Amino acid sequence: DRLRSRGLGDVYKRQVLLPCIGLMEHMVELLFPDDGSAAEEQEMDRLEERFLQHPALSIEQSRLVTNSMAERAEGNLLMAVGLRNRWSDKDFRMVGETESVIDRYEDKLGTYLMKITSKSLSQSQSEEVSKYLHTISDFERISDHALNISEAAKEIHDKDLQFSPEACHELDVIESAVREILSVAVGAFVENDPQRAARVEPLEEIIDGLCDEMKSHHVDRLQSGSCTLNQGFVFNDLLTNYERVADHCSNIAVAIIELESDSFDTHEYLNSVRAMKSSSFARYYEEYKQEYHL
């Protein structure tokens, strides 16, 4: 009887309790959320109205909050990219929740920075505020693309889509390049490092080239029948989002570099960089070309 009771208990655990574990975990998360929301509130509390009477202080608080926003956007993108190879319901939900948090960062920062611009600012202070106003939308858009990428990964998971080995290799390469450009751009922003920011544009061009090459290979696979239309739609969605993330990283780098030259003429800057092909640009381009190729 004891053995029979134990056997029935094992069956109960397998058939009744195990399927409920995921639901129970989700309920615990809802009842006892992590300290992410508390950390967000703590960050937002830096943007106090009374600091607006002291521009140096309000700008410094804005810098700290924008840096936090940048790092959250980077973390969200990395989490989303990781879902393609390692699916997790929890991480998928976290990407969506973090995207909402970053939306609130943009709203609060944008409003606060505009209030700062109405104060009497020195030229350097005005330029710093302009830098933040130029970049918070890029960080928000990067997080938007993280959400898009997570939804593409969910489609891959839900439909059990299997890419060809060639397509998987290509995605691994471009995802590695996107991780790198994001790390460089966010690091350059947080450290206010124009020299590091100068590495972004060469890598952005490499990523553009990879996307073009991958799209061409994708058409070949469709024609040969080694790739289906369903796989193709998701593949193209991923490429589009990776390419746009790189574009936003380029915008961030431009804001950092142009702050040093007292100008925000993005078009002029990019044209001059690409036309001159400075020694550092060419060196970084060749370095990344060797590292990221199909």
Go through each PLM region and give its residues.
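Cytosolic, long alpha-helical scaffolding segments
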Residues: 9-10, 14-294
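Positively charged, low-complexity/disordered segments
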Residues: 1-3, 7-8
